[in-house]
C-alpha cells in the first residue's frame, strides 16, 4: 500500500559558457518543490462487539495521528469481495469459511519477518485455540480477542440475599449451588445463567477437569465428550434447571443481557464480558474462577482461550505489507496493550500486557484478566486439557447446544443428549 515516491529536481543541461556566465552572475538554479509523499491506505474489516469496536476505532485514530505514510481505514468489504481488505478480524463460522479452500491469507509471522519487524507476542500456549497457529507454533494471525469462560456475580444481589460478596465462596459447583439456593430463597427468579453453554459446559469444564473431548479412532481424532464426567455435569445442570436455579437463554448474547440488567445474579461467560458489564453501570460486578468439582481427582486443571483473530490478506504488494507490519507493531506497544485490555476485556498478547494485568496501579480494571490468566495457567497443560484442533468447531458447538436444549426442555436425559451430540459431530 505504500508506493515509493521518488524525489526529483529539474536539472538543466548547460554548456560551458552558460555555466561560466551563471557562475559570474552567481545565479543559483532552484530545485523544483518536492512532490508530497502519497499516503497508503490499509483497509481493515471487523465485526467486534461494541466495546471492542470502539476501542479499535480509537486505536486506529492514534495510529493514523502518528503515521505519515500509512492510514488505517475501516472497510465494509470482507474477504469474499474481489479486492479483499488487507486486514480482517474474523471468528466463528466466518473464520472457518475464510480458511476453507484455497489459501486466502499470508501468515502473520511471514509478513513481520519479510518486513524486518519483530513480532512482540507471547509464544502461543497449548491452551489457546489452534486456529491461528501453524504446526511449528508460529502465528498465522494475531489473536486479538482471546477470552476464557469465568464466573461473574452481581454483588448487590448477593448482599440482598444476606451474603457477603467478599467472603462467600463459589469455588466449587457445590459452593455455587448453596449460593444459588439462597438467592432463590430471597426471591431471585434467575439465580444463574450461562452464555455459550456448549463452550462452557463441555469444552472448558472438560479441560478444567483434565477430561478429553476427543479420542483417536485409528489415525483420526473423533469427538468424545460424552464421558462420565460430562454426563454428570449436564445432569447436575438439568437438576438446577428444574429447581429454577438455572435459566438458559438460547439466542445470541441474551444471557449476558439478562445478567447486565440485573435479572440474573450469576453468569458463566467469556472473560471479556467484564468490559461490557461494567460499562452498563447498572450493577456491582464481581468476577471469580469457574467452579470445579472438588471430588474429582486433580481438579482444577486449566481452561481454554478462544476468540477472534486478525488475518492478513494474501496477494498484496510488499509496500502494503510494510504498512500492515507497522500497524501490528503499534498495536503491540505496551501502552496500547494496556488500553486494549482495559477497554475490551480481552487477554494480553505479550509480556507487557501480562505484567500490566498484575499491576496494583490499575486497581480492579483488569480483575477479569487476572482471574482468566489464573485459570489458564493454573497447572501445566496436558494432552487432555490442551486446545484441540477441531474442524467445524462452531458447528459442533451448535450441535451441542441443540442437544442440550432437549435437556432443558426435559425431553432428554443428559447421557442421551451428549451421545446424540457426539454422533452428529462425528458426521458433520
Stretches found by the model and what they are:
Residues 55-59, 232-236, 318-331, 417:
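Short amphipathic alpha-helical coupling segments at ligand-binding clamshell hinges
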Residues 109-123, 168-169, 191-192, 211-232, ...:
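Short, solvent-exposed loop/beta-turn-alpha elements that line the ligand-binding surface or hinge
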Residues 2-4, 15-17, 23, 28-102, ...:
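Conserved N-terminal structural module of periplasmic/extracytoplasmic solute-binding proteins
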Residues 95-150, 204, 286-288:
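Hinge/lid segment of periplasmic solute-binding proteins
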Residues 134, 367-425:
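C-terminal capping/gating helix-and-loop segments adjacent to ligand/active sites or protein-protein/ligand interfaces
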Residues 65, 161, 246, 279-347, ...:
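Extracytoplasmic/periplasmic substrate-recognition and gating elements
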Residues 177-183, 219-250:
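Glycine-centered hinge/linker elements that transmit conformational signals in sensory
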Residues 135-144, 174-222:
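Extracytoplasmic/periplasmic solute-binding protein
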Amino acid at each position: 500500500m505504500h508506493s515509493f515516491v521518488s524525489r526529483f529536481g529539474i536539472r538543466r543541461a548547460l554548456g560551458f559558457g552558460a555555466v561560466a556566465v551563471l557562475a559570474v552572475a552567481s545565479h543559483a538554479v532552484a530545485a523544483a518543490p518536492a512532490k508530497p509523499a502519497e499516503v497508503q491506505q490499509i483497509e481493515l474489516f471487523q465485526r467486534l462487539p461494541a466495546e471492542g469496536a470502539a476501542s479499535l476505532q480509537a486505536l486506529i485514530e492514534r495510529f493514523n495521528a502518528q503515521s505519515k505514510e500509512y492510514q488505517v481505514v475501516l472497510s465494509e468489504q470482507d474477504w469474499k469481495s474481489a479486492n479483499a481488505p488487507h486486514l480482517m478480524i474474523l471468528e466463528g463460522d466466518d473464520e472457518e469459511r475464510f480458511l476453507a479452500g484455497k489459501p486466502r491469507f499470508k501468515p502473520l509471522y511471514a509478513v513481520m519477518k519479510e518486513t524486518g519487524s519483530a513480532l512482540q507476542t507471547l509464544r502461543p500456549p497449548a491452551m489457546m485455540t489452534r486456529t491461528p497457529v501453524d504446526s511449528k507454533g508460529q502465528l498465522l494471525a494475531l489473536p486479538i480477542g482471546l477470552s476464557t469462560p469465568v464466573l461473574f456475580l452481581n454483588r448487590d444481589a448477593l448482599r440482598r440475599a444476606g451474603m457477603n460478596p467478599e467472603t462467600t465462596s463459589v469455588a466449587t459447583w457445590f459452593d455455587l449451588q448453596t449460593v444459588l439456593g439462597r438467592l432463590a430463597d430471597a426471591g431471585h427468579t434467575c439465580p444463574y445463567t450461562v452464555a455459550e453453554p456448549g463452550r462452557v459446559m463441555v469444552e472448558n469444564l472438560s479441560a478444567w477437569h483434565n477430561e478429553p473431548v476427543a479420542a483417536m479412532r485409528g489415525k483420526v481424532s473423533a469427538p468424545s465428550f460424552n464421558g462420565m464426567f460430562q454426563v454428570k455435569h449436564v445432569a447436575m445442570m438439568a437438576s438446577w434447571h428444574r429447581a429454577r436455579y438455572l435459566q438458559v437463554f438460547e439466542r445470541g448474547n441474551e444471557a449476558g443481557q439478562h445478567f447486565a440488567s440485573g435479572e440474573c445474579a450469576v453468569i458463566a461467560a467469556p472473560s471479556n464480558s467484564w468490559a461490557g458489564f461494567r460499562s452498563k453501570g447498572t450493577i456491582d460486578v464481581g468476577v471469580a474462577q469457574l467452579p470445579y468439582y472438588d471430588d474429582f481427582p486433580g481438579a482444577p486443571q486449566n481452561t481454554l482461550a478462544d476468540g477472534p483473530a486478525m488475518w492478513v490478506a494474501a496477494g498484496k504488494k510488499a509496500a502494503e505489507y510494510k504498512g500492515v507490519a507497522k500497524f501490528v507493531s503499534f498495536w503491540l506497544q505496551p501502552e496500547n496493550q494496556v488500553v486494549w485490555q482495559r477497554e475490551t476485556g480481552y487477554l494480553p498478547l505479550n509480556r507487557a500486557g501480562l505484567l500490566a494485568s498484575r499491576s496494583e496501579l490499575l486497581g480492579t480494571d483488569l480483575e477479569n484478566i487476572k482471574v482468566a490468566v489464573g485459570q489458564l495457567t493454573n497447572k501445566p497443560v496436558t494432552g487432555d486439557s490442551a486446545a484441540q484442533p477441531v474442524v467445524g468447531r462452531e458447528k459442533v458447538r451448535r450441535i451441542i447446544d441443540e442437544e442440550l436444549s432437549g435437556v432443558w426442555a426435559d425431553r432428554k436425559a443428559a447421557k442421551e443428549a451428549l451421545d446424540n451430540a457426539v454422533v452428529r459431530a462425528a458426521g458433520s
